[in-house]
Amino acid sequence: RLAAHWQQLEMESNGKRVDQTGRTLPFATSPVLWGEPGSNGQHAFFQMLHQGTDVLPLEIVAVRQSAHGLPGHHEMLLANALAQAQALMLGRASDCGHRHFPGNRPSTFLLLDALTPTSLGALIALQEHRVFVSGALWGINSFDQWGVELGKVLANDLQQRLASGNVEGLDASTAGMLCRLRQNGSH
Protein backbone atom coordinates (compact mmCIF):
# COMPACT_ATOMS: atom_id res chain seq x y z
CA ARG A 1 0.00 0.00 0.00
CA LEU A 2 2.99 2.31 -0.49
CA ALA A 3 1.34 3.93 -3.51
CA ALA A 4 -1.73 4.78 -1.40
CA HIS A 5 0.51 6.44 1.21
CA TRP A 6 2.29 8.46 -1.48
CA GLN A 7 -1.05 9.47 -3.00
CA GLN A 8 -2.25 10.95 0.26
CA LEU A 9 1.10 12.53 1.06
CA GLU A 10 1.47 14.29 -2.28
CA MET A 11 -2.08 15.16 -3.26
CA GLU A 12 -3.34 16.14 0.20
CA SER A 13 -0.21 18.18 0.90
CA ASN A 14 0.31 19.94 -2.43
CA GLY A 15 -3.06 19.72 -4.16
CA LYS A 16 -3.59 23.46 -3.82
CA ARG A 17 -4.54 26.15 -6.34
CA VAL A 18 -3.45 29.20 -4.32
CA ASP A 19 -0.21 30.14 -2.61
CA GLN A 20 0.16 31.17 1.03
CA THR A 21 -0.85 34.75 0.21
CA GLY A 22 -4.10 33.62 -1.45
CA ARG A 23 -2.88 34.32 -4.99
CA THR A 24 -4.14 31.85 -7.63
CA LEU A 25 -1.15 29.95 -8.99
CA PRO A 26 -0.59 30.19 -12.76
CA PHE A 27 0.73 26.60 -12.95
CA ALA A 28 -0.20 23.08 -11.89
CA THR A 29 0.95 21.96 -8.48
CA SER A 30 0.42 18.41 -7.25
CA PRO A 31 0.69 15.59 -9.77
CA VAL A 32 -1.93 12.87 -9.70
CA LEU A 33 -0.43 9.78 -8.09
CA TRP A 34 -1.52 6.18 -8.46
CA GLY A 35 0.26 2.90 -8.62
CA GLU A 36 0.17 -0.85 -8.30
CA PRO A 37 2.88 -3.44 -7.79
CA GLY A 38 4.27 -5.52 -10.64
CA SER A 39 2.13 -6.69 -13.49
CA ASN A 40 -1.03 -5.27 -11.85
CA GLY A 41 0.23 -1.80 -12.74
CA GLN A 42 1.35 -2.91 -16.18
CA HIS A 43 -2.12 -4.17 -17.08
CA ALA A 44 -4.01 -1.40 -15.27
CA PHE A 45 -2.54 1.73 -16.83
CA PHE A 46 0.65 1.27 -18.84
CA GLN A 47 -1.33 1.17 -22.09
CA MET A 48 -2.41 4.76 -21.43
CA LEU A 49 1.12 5.76 -20.41
CA HIS A 50 2.62 4.33 -23.62
CA GLN A 51 0.05 5.43 -26.20
CA GLY A 52 -2.33 7.83 -24.47
CA THR A 53 -2.84 11.43 -25.55
CA ASP A 54 -1.34 12.87 -22.34
CA VAL A 55 2.38 12.57 -21.67
CA LEU A 56 2.66 11.75 -17.98
CA PRO A 57 5.96 11.39 -16.15
CA LEU A 58 6.19 8.34 -13.92
CA GLU A 59 8.43 6.56 -11.48
CA ILE A 60 9.21 2.89 -11.49
CA VAL A 61 10.47 1.53 -8.17
CA ALA A 62 12.18 -1.87 -8.20
CA VAL A 63 14.14 -3.96 -5.72
CA ARG A 64 17.20 -5.81 -6.99
CA GLN A 65 17.24 -8.63 -4.41
CA SER A 66 14.22 -10.89 -4.13
CA ALA A 67 12.49 -11.21 -0.76
CA HIS A 68 11.16 -14.68 -1.67
CA GLY A 69 12.51 -17.89 -3.11
CA LEU A 70 10.31 -18.36 -6.18
CA PRO A 71 12.69 -19.38 -8.99
CA GLY A 72 12.67 -16.97 -11.92
CA HIS A 73 9.74 -14.92 -10.62
CA HIS A 74 11.70 -11.91 -9.41
CA GLU A 75 13.88 -11.85 -12.52
CA MET A 76 10.72 -11.76 -14.64
CA LEU A 77 9.37 -8.80 -12.61
CA LEU A 78 12.67 -6.94 -12.93
CA ALA A 79 12.82 -7.61 -16.68
CA ASN A 80 9.28 -6.27 -17.07
CA ALA A 81 10.07 -3.14 -15.05
CA LEU A 82 13.17 -2.47 -17.15
CA ALA A 83 11.24 -3.21 -20.37
CA GLN A 84 8.56 -0.68 -19.43
CA ALA A 85 11.19 2.01 -18.83
CA GLN A 86 12.87 1.19 -22.15
CA ALA A 87 9.59 1.19 -24.08
CA LEU A 88 8.55 4.51 -22.54
CA MET A 89 11.90 6.03 -23.51
CA LEU A 90 12.38 4.58 -27.00
CA GLY A 91 8.89 3.60 -28.14
CA ARG A 92 8.53 1.61 -31.35
CA ALA A 93 7.92 2.90 -34.86
CA SER A 94 5.21 1.25 -36.91
CA ASP A 95 3.26 2.15 -40.03
CA CYS A 96 0.23 0.64 -38.34
CA GLY A 97 -1.09 3.43 -36.08
CA HIS A 98 -2.32 1.25 -33.25
CA ARG A 99 1.08 -0.47 -33.04
CA HIS A 100 3.08 2.78 -32.97
CA PHE A 101 4.56 3.81 -29.64
CA PRO A 102 5.89 7.38 -29.74
CA GLY A 103 8.43 6.95 -26.93
CA ASN A 104 10.01 10.01 -25.32
CA ARG A 105 7.76 9.43 -22.29
CA PRO A 106 9.57 10.64 -19.15
CA SER A 107 10.23 8.13 -16.40
CA THR A 108 12.49 7.72 -13.40
CA PHE A 109 13.76 4.29 -12.36
CA LEU A 110 14.47 3.99 -8.64
CA LEU A 111 16.35 0.81 -7.79
CA LEU A 112 16.72 -0.40 -4.22
CA ASP A 113 19.38 -3.00 -3.53
CA ALA A 114 17.14 -4.83 -1.06
CA LEU A 115 13.85 -4.10 0.64
CA THR A 116 14.92 -3.39 4.20
CA PRO A 117 13.59 -1.04 6.88
CA THR A 118 16.46 1.32 6.02
CA SER A 119 15.87 1.34 2.26
CA LEU A 120 12.10 1.68 2.68
CA GLY A 121 12.64 4.52 5.15
CA ALA A 122 14.97 6.25 2.70
CA LEU A 123 12.39 5.91 -0.08
CA ILE A 124 9.64 7.38 2.12
CA ALA A 125 11.96 10.18 3.28
CA LEU A 126 12.77 10.99 -0.36
CA GLN A 127 9.07 11.35 -1.17
CA GLU A 128 8.38 13.42 1.96
CA HIS A 129 11.31 15.72 1.16
CA ARG A 130 10.10 16.08 -2.44
CA VAL A 131 6.65 17.12 -1.21
CA PHE A 132 8.07 19.66 1.24
CA VAL A 133 10.51 21.19 -1.26
CA SER A 134 7.85 21.37 -3.99
CA GLY A 135 5.49 23.15 -1.62
CA ALA A 136 8.21 25.60 -0.61
CA LEU A 137 9.11 26.35 -4.24
CA TRP A 138 5.45 26.88 -5.16
CA GLY A 139 4.83 29.05 -2.09
CA ILE A 140 2.08 26.82 -0.73
CA ASN A 141 1.52 25.44 2.74
CA SER A 142 1.91 21.69 2.33
CA PHE A 143 0.61 21.12 5.85
CA ASP A 144 -2.95 22.46 5.68
CA GLN A 145 -5.82 20.58 4.10
CA TRP A 146 -8.74 22.97 3.74
CA GLY A 147 -10.21 20.96 0.88
CA VAL A 148 -10.48 17.95 3.18
CA GLU A 149 -11.99 20.15 5.89
CA LEU A 150 -14.71 21.42 3.54
CA GLY A 151 -15.80 17.86 2.77
CA LYS A 152 -16.04 17.06 6.50
CA VAL A 153 -18.16 20.14 7.22
CA LEU A 154 -20.53 19.35 4.34
CA ALA A 155 -20.73 15.68 5.35
CA ASN A 156 -21.77 16.59 8.91
CA ASP A 157 -24.63 18.71 7.57
CA LEU A 158 -25.70 16.10 5.02
CA GLN A 159 -25.65 13.29 7.57
CA GLN A 160 -28.17 15.23 9.67
CA ARG A 161 -30.25 15.94 6.55
CA LEU A 162 -30.24 12.25 5.59
CA ALA A 163 -31.80 11.49 8.96
CA SER A 164 -34.33 14.35 8.87
CA GLY A 165 -35.08 14.60 5.14
CA ASN A 166 -34.67 18.40 5.26
CA VAL A 167 -33.52 19.65 1.83
CA GLU A 168 -34.20 23.35 2.45
CA GLY A 169 -31.37 25.53 1.15
CA LEU A 170 -29.63 22.72 -0.77
CA ASP A 171 -28.77 22.92 -4.45
CA ALA A 172 -31.08 20.92 -6.73
CA SER A 173 -28.53 18.19 -7.47
CA THR A 174 -27.71 17.44 -3.82
CA ALA A 175 -31.36 17.74 -2.74
CA GLY A 176 -32.46 15.31 -5.45
CA MET A 177 -29.80 12.76 -4.55
CA LEU A 178 -30.56 13.09 -0.84
CA CYS A 179 -34.26 12.38 -1.52
CA ARG A 180 -33.34 9.40 -3.66
CA LEU A 181 -31.05 8.00 -0.95
CA ARG A 182 -33.84 8.33 1.60
CA GLN A 183 -36.30 6.54 -0.74
CA ASN A 184 -33.96 3.59 -1.08
CA GLY A 185 -33.59 3.19 2.67
CA SER A 186 -29.97 4.20 3.16
CA HIS A 187 -30.80 6.49 6.12
Protein language model regions, located:
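A SIS-like phosphosugar-recognition module
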Residues: 1-187
